[in-house]
Amino acid sequence: MKRILLSLLLLISSLFSQSLLNKDTRIINENKGVILFFESDSCPYCKILKKDFLENKEMNAIAKKFNIYLINITEEKNYIVGKKKRKETTTSLRMAFASKASPNIVMFDKKWNKIFQIPGYADPKQMTTFMKFVQGLNEGKYKATQWKNFLKDNGIS
């Protein structure tokens, strides 16, 4: 009985955490930063990065302050983006951000300004630092021009 209850609790918590990484085709900011996570099914680093988002405590905590959208580059879908409900496809988004490989992360502040684009895998320390800067922009703590110093001060060069 305990085993069944424990398994059920783990399943529920796993399903709850998956909601952090959104596969929705309506991409909105809801007054948060936005992360577009270009992935593919055959990408081992995408799997590692998704696991980092869900299991690394510090990264998970800051990630909850963003709307994160998974965009599978091998699946052609139609997307509705932002308040203006701009219509995009997987291909048009890939072309707009020159996303030829995966993972490819594109981070926006809450005003839809592109702040960072990270091609390839970034470990939890790096990813957390990038997200902290964008969150600081959203909270008015930093100006976009301060990104180089912020990254350097936080061990990212």
PLM feature segments, named:
Residues D41-I48, P103-V106:
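C-type cytochrome heme c attachment motif
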Residues E30-C43:
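Short active-site neighborhood of thiol/selenol oxidoreductases, capturing the structured segment around
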Residues L93, A101-Q117:
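A short, hydrophobic beta-strand/beta-hairpin element that forms part of a small beta-sheet core
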Residues K47-I62:
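Typically the conserved alpha-helix immediately C-terminal to a functionally engaged Cys/Sec
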Residues I4-S13:
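Sec-dependent N-terminal signal peptides
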Residues F97-K100, I115-P124, T128-S157:
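Non-globular targeting/processing and membrane-anchoring segments
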Residues I62-K87:
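Thiol-based oxidoreductase modules, predominantly thioredoxin-like and allied folds used
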